[in-house]
């Protein structure tokens, strides 16, 4: 279980209020699909994923990216109980979708890159450490059903 300090919670909550969910979610998922092309197999109903520009401009990628990033909002509201907050999503990804749990870590790392790009100098090492702890905690929570 991941434990957050009050300072880490404050850092994440403050910065989360500045995140454009639509833009950041679509970019993070799009980058995941481009950088790790084997993840595309989970999105075969998304249409054209044949190139980087096709992926980044794909409305289904953007919509699902928004949905994924919205779930990070739930994580921020439930930082003290990530496992409980993601129990149903863990079950869905394990039992129905059969997603390799390593992909959750990959998405978290891609999200950190996107946040760093968007926030620039505001994304200090302290901020990165707090976000890294959150995305790692979410990945662990999503992988919980696999154990």
Curated annotation (Swiss-Prot):
Chain positions recorded as heme b binding sites: 64, 93
Has keyword ATP-binding? no
UniProt GO cellular component terms: blood microparticle; haptoglobin-hemoglobin complex; hemoglobin complex
What would be an example GO MF term here?
A: heme binding
Q: In which tissues is it expressed?
A: Red blood cells.
Which part of the chain is the Globin domain? 3-147
Residues the record lists as Phosphoserine modifications: 51
Checking InterPro entries in the record gives:
Globin, Globin-like_sf, Globin/Proto, Hemoglobin_b, Hemoglobin_oxygen_transport
Gene Ontology biological process terms in this record? hydrogen peroxide catabolic process
Which Gene3D superfamilies would you find in this protein's record? Globins
Q: Which UniProt keywords apply?
A: Heme, Iron, Metal-binding, Oxygen transport, Phosphoprotein, Transport
Q: What job does this protein perform?
A: Hemoglobin epsilon chain is a beta-type chain found in early embryos.
Similarity field: Belongs to the globin family.
What this protein is called in its record is Hemoglobin subunit epsilon
Q: Which organism is it from?
A: Oryctolagus cuniculus (Rabbit)
List the gene name. HBE1
């Amino acid at each position: 279980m991941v434990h957050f300090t009050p300072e880490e919670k404050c850092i994440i909550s403050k910065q989360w209020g500045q995140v454009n969910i639509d833009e950041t979610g679509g970019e993070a998922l799009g980058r995941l699909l481009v950088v790790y092309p084997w993840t595309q197999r989970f999105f075969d109903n998304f249409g054209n994923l044949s190139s980087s520009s096709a992926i980044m401009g794909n409305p289904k990628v953007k919509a699902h990216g928004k949905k994924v990033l919205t779930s990070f909002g739930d994580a921020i509201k439930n930082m003290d109980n990530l496992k409980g907050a993601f129990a149903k999503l863990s079950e869905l990804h394990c039992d129905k979708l059969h997603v390799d749990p390593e992909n959750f870590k990959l998405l978290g790392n891609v999200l950190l890159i996107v946040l760093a790009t968007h926030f620039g100098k505001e994304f200090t090492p302290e901020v990165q450490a707090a976000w890294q702890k959150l995305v790692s905690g979410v990945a662990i929570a999503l992988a919980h059903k696999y154990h």
